[in-house]
């Protein structure tokens, strides 16, 4: 048997809901009673499943049409300028300059890469300081081991590329640092569409660079005393946690 609903408040809204509920009980339609309240925002189930405790680090402010109420571009959702026109010859020349071998690093497993700060320097040289920026395109999703967020690269007022950055972390105290690493990862991925560091994906260049500037060495891990073979630049010495 359904119980009558009682409200201690005297507001008009409370009285209305109580009368509505009690009326439905009397008519036998209590199971169909609904309020008109709406959720604050909708979240896609797939995104919520990836978020830490079903939550994001930010709330979205994006507009579907990509234009804010003030008439400016909302880069959270807008695709303004993507593929609309090429940059001038001066910019393209700066972007196409070959990488300096001294700028390229190599990981112990043999993967060569360009440090993130070098990408920023190339962008500053091509577009000028303040002539480019990285804008968020999604909320920051935090899983039990990973931080990920989508970013867009905007140069001279037009969207150039969109990429998703990701960064591992090992404890909750490392989440703030991981969000910065995620941003840096997205920047490097976006720069691929501008041709920056394209040599790093060229098998011929990779083989030549490793032959001319790198060498494999047998080293010993200081903590475990295990021996292994690692890659290192010829102009560098073996560093912690390894010893020659």
From Swiss-Prot:
Can you provide one Gene Ontology molecular function annotated for this UniProt record? single-stranded DNA binding
Q: Biological process GO terms, please?
A: interstrand cross-link repair; mitochondrial genome maintenance; recombinational repair
What Pfam families does UniProt report for this protein, alphabetically?
Mgm101p
The places in or outside the cell where this protein is found are: Mitochondrion matrix, Mitochondrion nucleoid
Look up the transit peptide and give its residue range. Answer: 1-22
Q: Which UniProt keywords apply?
A: DNA damage, DNA repair, DNA-binding, Mitochondrion, Mitochondrion nucleoid, Transit peptide
Query: Which cellular component terms (GO) are annotated to the entry?
Result: mitochondrial chromosome
Membership in a protein family: Belongs to the MGM101 family.
Protein name in the entry? Mitochondrial genome maintenance protein MGM101
Please give the organism: Candida glabrata (strain ATCC 2001 / BCRC 20586 / JCM 3761 / NBRC 0622 / NRRL Y-65 / CBS 138) (Yeast)
Query: What gene is it encoded by?
Result: MGM101
């Amino acid at each position: 048997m359904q119980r009558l609903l009682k409200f201690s408040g005297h507001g008009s809204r409370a009285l209305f809901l109580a009368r509505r509920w009690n009326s439905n009980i009397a008519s036998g339609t209590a199971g169909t009673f609904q309020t008109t309240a709406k959720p604050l925002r909708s979240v896609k189930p797939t995104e919520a499943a990836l978020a830490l405790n079903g939550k994001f680090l930010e709330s979205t402010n994006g507009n579907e049409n990509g234009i804010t109420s003030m008439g400016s571009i909302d880069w959270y959702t807008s695709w303004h300028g993507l593929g609309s026109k090429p940059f001038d010859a001066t910019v393209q020349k700066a972007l196409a300059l070959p990488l300096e071998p001294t700028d390229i690093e190599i990981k112990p497993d043999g993967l060569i890469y360009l440090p993130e700060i070098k990408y920023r320097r190339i962008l500053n040289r091509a577009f000028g300081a303040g002539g480019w920026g990285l804008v968020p395109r999604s909320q920051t999703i935090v899983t039990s081991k990973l931080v990920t967020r989508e970013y867009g690269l905007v140069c001279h007022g037009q969207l150039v590329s969109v990429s998703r950055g990701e960064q591992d972390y090992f404890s909750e105290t490392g989440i703030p640092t991981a969000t910065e690493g995620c941003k840096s990862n997205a920047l490097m991925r976006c720069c691929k569409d501008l041709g920056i560091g394209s040599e790093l994906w060229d098998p011929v260049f990779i083989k030549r660079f490793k032959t001319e500037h790198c060498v494999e060495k047998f080293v010993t891990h200081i903590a475990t005393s295990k021996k292994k073979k690692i890659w290192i630049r010829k102009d560098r010495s073996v560093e912690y946690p390894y010893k020659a």
